[in-house]
Amino acid sequence: MGCAQPRDEHGGNLARRIAVQLGLDNVPAVTVNRFCASSVQTARMAFHAIRAGEGHAYVSAGVECVSRYQDFGSAGVDPEETHNPQFAGAKQRTQRIAAANERWHDPRNDGELPDIYIAMGQTAENVATLRSISRTEQDEFGLRSQHLAEKAIANGLIDTEIAPVTLADGTVVTADDGPRPGTTMEAVAALPPVFRPDGTVTAGNCCPLNDGAAAVVIMSDVRAAELGLRPLARIVATGVSAVSPEIMGLGPVEASRRALTNAGLSIRDIDLVEINEAFAVQVIASYRDLGIDLDRLNVHGGAIAFGHPFGSTGARIMTTLLNAMQLRDVSLGLETMCVGGGQGMAIILERVT
């Protein structure tokens, strides 16, 4: 099970606690943290284990209850005291840039360490600076996500992706609470920048903070045949990349290229693409670098509308991609995302028909 913050209520090997709760105490379980790509990593681990002949069936899942996070400092620990002092200069540079006192440039060009502790919003602003992506372009993409999500929900296109959840008071949750129907360009354009006085990233062109969980079953073809099950798709290849933490939003570019190389494919072979919408700016930069047409990208909206519960997003996007591939009767799909700390992950799926 993927979880980006496996502490507090998420702690104590959450995956194992869930397995025991489900009556599966005879099934081993592990909680995996690769920040935003945590549940993609669980899928990759299952894929590798099956290919190595070390298992046949895995539940690849992820969860994040962002609303339940406790302030790290509430435990009596100053977060600053946990940071490596070697990054003090990098943190000070980030603070100057955030205050609009300095323009971002890659510190590695000066032989300096990048800021490993940098806030994600600051990395988005850095990508906007590096790639000259305007506020208007970001707002337009954010609006696109909301409108596509609104249309998909209204037409029942994502109903099969959602498992109803019954709350303690008996309320049954059957729909995502993130999308904002009726969002207009005027409303999005009126929002102030969040991270820098002169910034371009707003609440309208980045993902909201949500709670969520998602899961997929990954199984060998041998076991599926034994059980009489028909797989939806097969995993073709995966890819992982590393970039400077200060421009982590560009991680999907190299990760996708590596996955495509491992699969012996080109981006032209891919029918549908899901890039996690942590920030509009990093999706724009990524799809432009990769040469992806918009009519193939996030066709039912993305995290700007639905949210990004970090540990669960990889599995959620996989279900979204599989659903869209079925609805459009296409063969190949690419899922990719940036990862806090300066990484990227990608996974290629092929429908089994």
List each model region and its residues.
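N-terminal extracellular/periplasmic Venus flytrap/periplasmic-binding protein-like
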Residues: 137-226, 289, 294-296
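Conserved beta-ketoacyl condensing-enzyme motif
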Residues: 1-58, 63-85, 162-175, 246-247, ...
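Condensing-enzyme catalytic core mediating Claisen C-C bond formation in acyl metabolism
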Residues: 97-102, 129, 185-250, 254, ...
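Conserved catalytic cysteine-centered active-site region
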Residues: 3-58, 115-118, 182-208, 289-316, ...
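Short, well-ordered amphipathic alpha-helical segments that serve as non-catalytic structural scaffolds
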Residues: 14-18, 42, 120-127, 143-148, ...
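Active-site-proximal alpha-helical scaffold in enzymes
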Residues: 30, 34-64, 72, 128-157, ...
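Active-site pocket-lining segment
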Residues: 6, 122-125, 236-305
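Flexible glycine-/small-residue-enriched beta->alpha junction loops
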Residues: 57-126
